[in-house]
Curated annotation (Swiss-Prot):
KW Nucleotide-binding (keyword) present: no
CDD domains: IHF_B (cd13836)
Entry-linked NCBIfam families: hip (TIGR00988), PRK00199.1 (NF001222)
Xref: SUPFAM superfamilies: IHF-like DNA-binding proteins (SSF47729)
Name listed for the protein in its UniProt record: Integration host factor subunit beta
GO BP terms in the entry: DNA recombination; regulation of DNA-templated transcription; regulation of translation
This protein's UniProt keywords: DNA recombination, DNA-binding, Transcription, Transcription regulation, Translation regulation
Function summary: This protein is one of the two subunits of integration host factor, a specific DNA-binding protein that functions in genetic recombination as well as in transcriptional and translational control.
Family of the protein in this entry: Belongs to the bacterial histone-like protein family.
Gene Ontology MF terms: DNA binding; structural constituent of chromatin
Amino acid sequence: MTKSELIASLKADNPHLTERDVETIVSTIFDEISNALARGARVELRGFGAFTIKRRDARVGRNPRTGETVSVDEKVVPFFKAGKELRERVNNGTRKNGGSADAASGG
């Protein structure tokens, strides 16, 4: 599901809201999560999951095309850990749809 598909789905479920209102709400939620992570804060949505940041140490990597070794700097990356309710819902959904994650996502 893309952001525009999410907006369309929420708009269909909430006909009293305009598409612009739904788009503003969705964008604001994403912005707030991004801003919190940029500050180093943890974002927990009970039952859904938690967004955190993880530090990746500097390392020596390899260019897959040339085989040349390259230095990869330390970096911070966003990380999502699914909550129990989300994991259970996904697992129940994939079992009902033939047992694959692709079946549950429609792809």
